[in-house]
């Protein structure tokens, strides 16, 4: 079983010899919850990331930090810019990926992922970044701009459900995680279909968007978004195959070693 999910999930992840992966285990009453902090890290083996095994490869990255990320404030579709740390995270990601010759680039149409992509591509400024509306962050509706403590005062049950059963929550005047998954997966599928042999594509988006895409690749429901970690500036690598019988493979998930640590400290729950 793959973290209690269908056993065919093992075909969609990659674990190399002597690589390391980290799982966060939490206990509540008599049950346990598992969160994937990272998978198949190889930087300690003098390899920034595993060798490509597919016909093309996508580098999926979460945008750099904003002040609202730092404060733990729900930002959603409010277009908060990168703060100085977020710009530094993007620069460190550029350095980590310096030897990658991207020939395609995609971004959420919001500014924080677009600015992150621009910094990563600073040596390849002629490459056009396609901005995609369907990859914008989840709309938190009336929660946007609020701290979790403020939301707990007004919507305590809904906030608890967001943490425990996110698939059952529709944000007040906002979206559900199902809405995000449907639009994000549709956009990602189009990106995958556009890939040609040996394409190396950059895709910069958001926490909820990235998590729903990864859930879809793993073949698990979007209700499992909290099982996936996506740190600001974290890198996830997806290998794609021309053979329709071969599913995409997550060759590495949430690489953050280039940012100064293995464990990321992004605020939990605030997207």
Language-model features: locations:
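Acidic, low-complexity terminal tails and accessory targeting/binding regions
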Residues: 2-61, 70, 96, 141-150, ...
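Phosphate-coordination/substrate-recognition cap region in phosphate-metabolizing enzymes
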Residues: 4, 21, 33, 91-160
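Phosphate-handling substructures
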Residues: 80-81, 122-185, 249-252, 264, ...
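Loop-to-helix element that buttresses phosphate recognition and phosphoryl-transfer chemistry
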Residues: 67-123, 154, 167-186
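His/acidic metal-ligating clusters that form di-metal
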Residues: 195, 203-208
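Short, conserved phosphate/pyrophosphate- and ester-handling motifs at nucleotide-, phospho-/glycolipid
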Residues: 63, 86, 206
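GST superfamily/GST-like fold recognition
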Residues: 207-211, 249
